[in-house]
Regions:
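C-terminal catalytic histidine-bearing segment of alpha/beta-hydrolase fold enzymes
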Residues: 322-360
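Cap/lid segment of the alpha/beta-hydrolase catalytic domain
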Residues: 137-210, 264-276
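The feature captures the conserved acid-bearing segment of alpha/beta-hydrolase catalytic domains
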Residues: 266-329, 336
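N-terminal cap/lid segment of alpha/beta-hydrolase-fold proteins
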Residues: 8-14, 67-70, 78-125
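Short beta-strand elements
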Residues: 15-18, 42-67
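Short, aromatic- and glycine-rich surface loops/edge beta-strands on solvent-exposed regions
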Residues: 30-42
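Hydrolase active-site cap/lid region
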Residues: 171, 235, 239-284, 336, ...
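Gly/Ser-rich "nucleophile elbow"/oxyanion-hole loop immediately N-terminal to the catalytic nucleophile
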Residues: 190-236
Length: 360
């Protein structure tokens, strides 16, 4: 047993065969308790990894944002606005004849273009736009970079599959392996170097966010866009990209995200919460990328659906995700799943789920 109160309990106990195993604990402050249990000798996936929260409505960001948060992002967006789109489109073979598929490349700040695939229905008409973003490791994998399937190029919406790193999509594995190595710093993976993260100007995520925003800005200029609905979609790092972009581009109306990453970095560093057990250690520059700070700035008439949050996910810890949810000032929904880690969920049927919604 661990938790946002810093308490740790461990031990072994016999398993009753005719009734549930019951473990009783408590927490004296708003936050979550995590319970990890496994059946001795039964294999790695015969386990429980989940938890419970107390005073859910009072689980909020523990420390304030930088005083110059808005000034910093205004400065960066103003610099981005000085760079022309200069869109370069290369039509490629489409997985379905009813859809036109192209690689896109857009002018952007911070030395790298905004890139990805765009699929547009060929039938005359106006369509909503969907921007897809991908997880940390996933963003280097074929799931993010390979040519879309027919299912990923629908006939009822415009889809941009945005490359997180400003790379050309549809290349071979060696290309991405070399690019991933180059994106690292001081032996850390992209975005993990504490020296880079000491200042927001040198954080890897700054360029990533500007590339994402640039893709959304360009999408607004497409003659096929219906001018009404623009949706962002992604999980983990892709969930962060979705909400970063939504906060900085007010044309975005909807978000569908799961296990969103980068929430309430200071909660672990200064508040004693159970923080992420993977990736970046806290550094001051990360305050400018904390997703809770962006959530406050999403337009109040938008809609955010966090359709999956794991109660055993301590890459994206529940207290941080709850803080994100409570910072949103728009209609919202969150679905908590019991016995669910970041990339593993119990195969058992009938897992406990808890859903919260709010009209504002």
């Amino acid at each position: 047993r661990t938790g946002d109160d810093g308490k740790v309990e461990e031990g072994t106990a016999p398993i009753p065969f005719r009734e549930p195993f019951v473990y009783t604990t408590s927490i004296a402050k708003p936050g979550f308790v995590r319970l990890f249990a496994e059946v001795v000798g039964a294999g790695p996936n015969v386990k429980f990894d989940g938890g419970a929260g107390a005073a859910f409505d009072r689980i909020v960001q523990m420390h304030g944002e930088p005083d110059d948060f808005d000034a910093f992002w205004k400065r960066e967006l103003d610099a981005l606005a000085q760079v022309p789109f200069d869109p370069q489109l290369e039509e490629v073979a489409s997985p379905r004849p009813e859809v036109k598929l192209s690689r896109f490349r857009l002018g952007c700040a911070k030395g790298k273009p905004s890139t990805g695939f765009i699929s547009v229905p060929r039938a005359p008409g106006k369509y909503p736009v969907r921007l897809y973003f991908f997880g940390y490791n996933e963003s280097w994998s074929p799931r993010a970079t390979a040519f879309p399937t027919a299912q990923q190029a629908p006939t009822n919406e415009i889809v941009l599959r945005v490359n997180a790193h400003g790379l050309e999509n549809g290349r071979d594995a060696a290309y991405y392996a070399a690019a991933r190595k180059a994106a690292g710093s001081n032996g850390y993976g992209h975005g993990f170097d504490p020296a880079e993260n000491a200042k927001p100007e040198t954080c890897y995520y700054l360029g990533m966010i500007l590339r994402d925003v640039r893709a959304a800005q360009w999408a607004k200029t497409l003659p096929e866009w219906d001018g009404r609905k623009m949706l962002v979609y992604g999980g983990s790092q892709g969930g962060a990209q979705s909400l970063w972009t939504m906060a900085l581009e007010p044309a975005i109306t909807d978000a569908e995200v799961f296990i969103p990453w980068m929430c309430d970095w200071r909660g672990k560093a200064f508040g004693g919460r159970s923080g992420t057990d993977w990736g970046s250690e806290y550094a001051p520059g990360l305050d400018y990328f904390d997703l809770v700070n962006f959530a406050k700035r999403i337009r109040p008439d938008a809609y955010v659906n966090i359709f999956h949050a794991g109660l055993g996910d301590y890459i994206c810890p529940p207290a941080g995700v709850a803080s994100l949810y409570h910072a949103l000032r728009c209609p919202k929904r969150i679905r908590w799943v019991q016995n669910c880690e970041h990339s593993w969920s119990s195969p058992a049927k009938g897992k406990q789920e808890t859903v919260f919604t709010s009209p504002h």
